[in-house]
Amino acid sequence: MVEKMIDKQLMQKRFSERATTYDRFANVQKKMAHALMKRIVHPPQTILEIGCGTGYLTKLLHDAYPKAELTAVDIAPGMIEKAKQRLGDAPITWLCADIEEAELYEMYDLIISNATFQWLTAPKQTIAKLAKQRNERGQLLFSTFGDRTFHELHTSFAYALAIQQIDEPLRIGPSFPTFSEWLAMHDQARGHEQFEVEYFPSVRDFFLSLRHIGATNSTSGRYCQRPSVFKAMMHEYEQRFSEQGLIRATYHCIFIDIT
């Protein structure tokens, strides 16, 4: 299991700052939102959405179930404001909160989250807490990312450390649980994994896209900032993982269903 400590204040700040650019760059996350919608088992009357972001999934939910009572939660106030703009005067309850700290009193037919649980400090405990808030026949449904996400970046970085003869526990980017580890977080969990690939003109463009969605380092740990290592990493990445002049970046998309 990947152990991590998320800097929640830093994460909140970065996602708020990127609320205006998120939708232009979150292509994979949008695909995942549509995939989640297809996995809803029963039409819900009460919905809790965790990590609503700019409201992309929120709008899909509201359009599909306009009579449902929908509560949307996000840790970043900037994201909440953007979501409110997207949904207009839709009767949605908005809550700016950290779901790991929030006390939940209501029961829900559907608890749903898109591309958020990878940022939880204690995902197993949070999943258990949320699963208890389901109504009878209720569903906890979420998408997240697995350990093979950005494997090209991690492979190239490991190569750069090796040729620089650096034997230190340095890393680049976040580390996520495996598909099996996500499934093991709840005894009723069922799941599916798939891979999505995006292409960029350069590694710098790839990094820029991550910055625009706020998905930069918010975890504690030792991150390498040596220019020589980054230069070697970028060279290896562009030599090894290029196709027709574009570098590729793989997303390991995981869908978990608890019913």
From Swiss-Prot:
Ranges in a coiled coil: none
Extent of the signal sequence: none
One Pfam entry name: Methyltransf_25
Catalyses which reaction(s): malonyl-[ACP] + S-adenosyl-L-methionine = malonyl-[ACP] methyl ester + S-adenosyl-L-homocysteine
Pathway the protein contributes to: Cofactor biosynthesis; biotin biosynthesis
Any one Gene Ontology molecular-function term assigned to this protein's record: carboxyl-O-methyltransferase activity
Disulfide bonds: none
Gene3D superfamilies: Vaccinia Virus protein VP39
CDD domains listed in its UniProt record: AdoMet_MTases (cd02440)
Documented EC number(s): 2.1.1.197
InterPro entries documented for this protein: BioC (IPR011814), Methyltransf_25 (IPR041698), SAM-dependent_MTases_sf (IPR029063)
UniProt keyword annotations, A-Z: Biotin biosynthesis, Methyltransferase, S-adenosyl-L-methionine, Transferase
Single Gene Ontology BP annotation: biotin biosynthetic process
HAMAP family xrefs: BioC (MF_00835)
Function noted in UniProt: Converts the free carboxyl group of a malonyl-thioester to its methyl ester by transfer of a methyl group from S-adenosyl-L-methionine (SAM). It allows to synthesize pimeloyl-ACP via the fatty acid synthetic pathway.
Record family assignment: Belongs to the methyltransferase superfamily.
Entry protein name: Malonyl-[acyl-carrier protein] O-methyltransferase
Annotated organism of origin: Anoxybacillus flavithermus (strain DSM 21510 / WK1)
Lineage: Bacteria, Bacillati, Bacillota, Bacilli, Bacillales
